[in-house]
């Protein structure tokens, strides 16, 4: 993809989570799905999201800490990330001794873990948490319904921060410390981040 000659690494396959969708679009999808299904459908609040991600654990992740081997649990920035450095007319991963590699192999990563996915992988490729939920902390991060204000909610937010929406979880390009069940990120509702998708809550009417 760096040479604009091939599609590169596919991130739009049916089994992969949706990305590059704004909060506005994700919320509109939930509303439309609710009308079609007759159920209450919505994005989770960040409190709901964290409760589900932790699955009863008080640690960084349901499976352990930021130093745990996440290879069979979540798709995060691991040793496969080095293969994002590519070269050639039909791009292939650069050799380890390629002098240009240092200019492309710049993403921070955990080199002693291999989760066997370069970018986003098929949903449910890794072990579920104790409550049966997949990919809560990895693969792609997720929009929530919540405004980006101080959390837990103790103070009033100013207009600038309240305009943003909370994103929770990590992704294939983020290290564990940026992917824990407590980490918060924020984007404006019209933004379409390349590593952010969403999941929904479905309740009977």
Residue ranges and their predicted role:
Residues 188-189:
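C-terminal beta-signal and terminal closure region of outer-membrane beta-barrel proteins
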Residues 3-183, 192-194:
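Functional-site microenvironments in short loops/helix caps that host divalent-cation chemistry
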Residues 194-205:
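Short, structured beta-strand segments at or near domain termini in extracellular proteins/domains
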């Amino acid at each position: 993809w760096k040479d604009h000659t091939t599609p590169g690494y596919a991130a739009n396959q049916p089994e992969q989570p949706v990305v590059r969708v704004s909060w506005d679009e994700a919320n509109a999808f939930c509303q439309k799905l609710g009308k079609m299904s007759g159920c209450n459908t919505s994005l989770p609040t960040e409190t709901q999201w964290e409760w589900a991600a932790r699955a009863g654990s008080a640690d960084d992740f349901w499976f352990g800490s930021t130093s745990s081997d996440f290879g069979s649990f979540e798709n995060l920035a691991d040793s496969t990330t080095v293969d994002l450095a590519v070269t050639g007319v039909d791009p292939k991963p650069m050799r380890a001794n390629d002098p240009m590699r240092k200019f492309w192999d710049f993403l921070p990563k955990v080199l002693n873990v291999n989760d066997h996915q370069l970018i986003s992988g098929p949903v449910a490729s890794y072990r579920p948490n104790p409550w049966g939920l997949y990919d809560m902390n990895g693969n792609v991060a997720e929009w929530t319904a919540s405004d980006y204000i101080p959390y837990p909610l103790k103070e009033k937010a100013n207009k600038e921060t309240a305009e943003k929406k909370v994103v929770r979880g990590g992704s294939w390009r983020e290290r564990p410390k940026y992917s824990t069940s407590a980490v918060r990120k924020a984007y404006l509702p019209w933004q379409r981040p390349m590593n952010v998708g969403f999941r929904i809550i479905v309740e009977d009417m």
